[in-house]
Design a protein with these regions (language model features):
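Boundary at the C-terminal end of the N-terminal hydrophobic targeting segment
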Residues: 13-15, 21
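Divalent metal-binding pocket/active-site signature
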Residues: 177, 183-236
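Active-site neighborhoods of metal-dependent hydrolases
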Residues: 145-146, 150, 154-165, 169-193, ...
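Divalent-metal coordination cores built from histidine and acidic residues
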Residues: 75-80, 84-91, 95-188, 207-208, ...
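Charged helix-capping and loop-helix junction motifs
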Residues: 99-101, 200-205, 232-237, 266-268, ...
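Histidine-rich, glycine-flanked metal-binding segment
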Residues: 23-28, 36-83
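Short, ordered loop/turn segments at secondary-structure junctions
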Residues: 62, 119-120, 189-191, 221-223, ...
Length: 438
């Protein structure tokens, strides 16, 4: 049964008014005997839950209230909770696929609502995306962003050039249409091309359009490490966008990625708290893994090398002077990630390298890790699990009241199907970083 989060919170008072104890009532499904943890932060309590259609219509003592169910689920010894909301997924493709539209990797974790088109991606025709899901049906509730990277790519292509006034107006129009068609805000992936080519001012102009339609700003930061402006600079940039565009901001998969920024969690938290005191609405999500998920290209290539797309990259590689510069900067980026052994191929069309680390691939190919990485990129790239975070930073972010859990799920990384179980097992029941009500 898929029920919305908001409805569960609203239902108890209204349900009890609608169903006095002396009047028997029948529900479709009665979940009986469980411990209800309702998401408000309150301690769990014994309560039965009655569902009719797609609504929760009763929360309380079913026997005392004479509530019976056409179907009864015995939940003694189990926790009953609202369906989880995952604020950061990459489920757009799955929901549009006839064989995967049920979204089982999420439903099986207890996730009943997903947000998607994060990281500045997804289609620009939001109306068509939502209409397709409505027509064909999907397994979870879903909400979508309009991706700034997709918007920029649609108007400017893969160029790093600044938009002309006319092009900027065109991008504004795309965002406005998407918001009118049902997007809840604008997402950015300022670490990824082509979104990374936008200046802060350019992003602010598009965010203002989302704000005018009541939307929020969701961002994969421009830098979660020390690639360009640094983690602290990137957090400050996101806060500036919220301040100047006048909209709430949400930082995706908040983290300190790589040894250069390990230990900066406290400073990041202080920046966010300062912005909140200023009146800016700031929230974040994270996944409970020390390995991030990205591509070989995004891990190793400097941002300038991505301008113009794959064909332009091939031309740069073919030029001896440019190649020398490229390889040198890729070496630095590999060290930021923790070295070649920290990059595990998690999804690729080349099955010969699937499940292998980049250092082992380099040995098998009799070349250096950077050259092996460049070969993979030019052959179409591959997804990697990148082991680059410390538990101490993860836990400091986790306990903040503005941080929720989001999977950032992608093929090949266990976070797509294991984020919420891992959070409960590892950080609630084993390490006691969080309590169950939290």
């Amino acid at each position: 049964v898929t029920c919305s989060y908001a409805r569960l919170f609203c239902s108890p008072a209204s349900a009890q008014r609608a169903a006095p104890a002396q009047q028997p009532q029948q529900v479709d499904v009665l979940v009986r005997g469980g411990t209800l943890v309702d998401g408000t932060g309150s301690q769990g309590r014994a309560a039965d839950v009655g569902i009719r259609g797609d609504r929760i219509v009763f929360v309380g003592n079913a026997s005392a209230s004479r509530v019976t169910g056409s179907r009864t689920i015995e939940a003694a010894g189990l926790i009953v909770a609202p369906g989880f909301i995952d604020p950061h997924t990459h489920t757009g493709g799955d929901l549009s696929n006839a064989e995967r539209k049920s979204n089982l990797p999420y439903l099986m974790q207890g996730v009943t609502t997903v947000l998607t088109n994060n990281d500045g991606g997804g289609p620009v025709d939001i109306g068509a995306q939502l209409a397709g899901w409505t027509r064909n049906g999907i397994g979870t509730n879903a909400a979508v962003y309009i991706g700034q990277g997709s918007v920029r790519g649609a108007v400017l292509g893969p160029t790093a050039a600044a938009p002309t006034p006319r092009q900027l107006d065109s991008m504004r129009a795309v965002v406005a249409r998407a918001m009118n068609d049902g997007a809840i805000g604008m997402s950015t992936g300022l670490y990824y091309a082509p979104g990374s080519f936008a200046t802060t001012d350019e992003v602010i102009e598009l965010a203002k359009v989302a704000a005018a339609h009541g939307g929020n700003y969701d961002s994969h930061l421009r830098d979660e490490s020390s690639y360009t402006i640094g983690l602290l600079g990137a957090v400050s940039e996101a806060i500036r966008i919220g301040r100047e565009a006048h909209l709430p901001i949400h930082i995706s998969h908040i983290k300190a990625l790589g040894a250069d920024v390990w230990g900066q969690a406290d400073t990041v938290i202080a920046l966010i708290r300062s912005a909140q005191r200023e009146g800016i609405k700031v929230s974040a999500d994270q996944y409970p893994y020390t390995a991030s998920g990205t591509s070989v290209g995004a891990s190793l290539l400097p941002r300038w090398a991505e301008a113009g797309g794959r064909d332009s990259l091939r031309m740069r590689v073919a030029d001896p002077a440019t190649r020398t510069r490229l390889v040198a900067e890729m070496e630095v980026n590999m060290k930021r990630r923790g070295g070649a052994a920290s990059l595990l191929i998690s999804s690729t069309r080349d099955t010969s390298i699937l499940g292998k680390r980049l250092d082992a691939i380099a040995v098998a190919r009799h070349t250096t890790p950077v050259e092996a990485g460049l070969q993979i990129i030019l052959a179409g790239d591959a997804s990697v699990a990148s082991f680059n975070m410390k538990d101490s930073d993860i836990e400091k972010f986790m306990v903040q009241d503005f941080v929720s859990t989001g999977s950032d799920g992608s093929d090949g990384h266990p976070r797509k199907y294991g984020t919420f179980p891992r959070l409960l097992r590892e950080y609630v029941y084993t390490k006691h970083v969080l309590t169950l009500p939290q």
